[in-house]
């Protein structure tokens, strides 16, 4: 499945957070949602990305819900979140179901399947923006989308 484009309907999903609660996309309609997919907790690139979202959280807070999604399990997510004092929730997608629905679970350059680092801005159930995973690039897109 290709990566979802702007204007596409965002697939509804329910996933568990690093704290064991469940989050359902369709229940988050009160403000936009920034949903960023990343490959793996506590790896160099993913740690940088998550810390950028952490550091930009005050800019996002009033404007959007922010969630990171990776295949890591809840215990790994919780340890990663605690280690870096992440101030947003991490969602666990161990079977890559949601990543596949959004089109970000695909073959990579090395010939193996994995997550293509992608951030979506979702407004009223639609993809309002799609950006690279860097927090400072995404934040401006919330107002624009």
Q: What do the PLM-derived regions correspond to, one by one?
A:
Residues 1-145:
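Chalcogenol-based redox active-site neighborhoods
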């Amino acid at each position: 499945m290709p990566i979802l484009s702007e204007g596409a309907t965002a697939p509804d999903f329910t996933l568990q957070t690093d704290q064991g609660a469940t989050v359902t996309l369709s229940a988050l309609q009160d403000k936009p949602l920034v949903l960023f997919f990343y490959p793996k907790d506590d790896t160099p690139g993913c740690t940088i990305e998550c810390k950028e979202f952490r550091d930009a959280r005050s800019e996002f807070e009033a404007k959007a819900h922010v969630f990171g999604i990776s295949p890591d399990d809840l215990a790994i997510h919780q340890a990663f979140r605690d280690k870096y004092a992440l101030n947003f929730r991490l969602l666990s997608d161990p079977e890559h179901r949601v990543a596949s629905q959004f089109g970000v679970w695909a073959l990579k350059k090395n010939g193996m399947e994995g997550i293509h680092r992608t951030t979506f801005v979702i407004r009223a159930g639609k993809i309002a923006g799609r950006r690279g995973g860097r927090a400072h690039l995404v934040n401006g897109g919330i107002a624009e989308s």
